[in-house]
Amino acid sequence: MTVAQTIRSRIMAQGAGKRVRRAQIGLIYCAVQLESGSTGVAFTFPAQRSGQPCGAGLSGQGNLAGRSAGQLIEHLGSEELVSSALGMAASNAVIAECFADPHALGGDILDHLDIREGDRICMVGCFLPVLERLGNLAVEVTTVDQVAKPGAEPAERVERLLPESQVAIITGTSIINNTIDDILRLAAGCREVAVLGPSTPLLADAFRDFQVRCLSGIRVDDPDAVFRIIGEGGGFRFFKAVSYTHLRAHET
């Protein structure tokens, strides 16, 4: 199974019994809140979805509130990116309510990775705060991204860079657009593989067969604040009402 299929299979039974209180699709992120208050977010790929028809899939239906979370989760991995993102956000909300891991860790993601002097690190997706902190270490860092960014290599370079690396730091958004499975195959020789970002599902069990060592995501502490930021087109750097949460996927 793919990563998206594995996540769906692990949580669908719980998701079918949870109702959506509200859902919101912003410019950069979407959010789903359950009746319990548990909330998840996911990236909506604003730069990549311009060729997709307006109102395609779940995003054009206008009646997400009141549905079962399972109805959204089943769209995780859909070719329609916003529908897949809503499926990821609903998955994260269900995981936060039903699968909270007692082994979750706080602090800085770099505190939980086995990074050694001289390591080659390939970052798939550009996380500027992490990149800045890596700059203080005696390592070689290369970033690849689908969107052209200063200092980032084109996405196709990942086929050469990842197999040459000891550490892979992979954006959780790659689950949404179905690129993570190929990326993980390329990272098979890496000593340390981490999946990072607000979209990342904190479900260690779903990654045990995919050599992912660390999951780094968020817990939404103030849903109203997060919905307001997303509704106003804000991105991750404005997410203040969240807690950064990390799991060692093979040690729980």
Question: Where in the sequence are the language-model features?
Answer:
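Conserved class I S-adenosyl-L-methionine
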Residues: 120-123
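A short, well-structured juxtamembrane/interface segment
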Residues: 99-114
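Short, Gly/Pro- and small/polar-rich lid/capping loops
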Residues: 1-21
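Histidine/lysine/aspartate-rich catalytic loop segments that bind and position anionic ligands
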Residues: 130-160
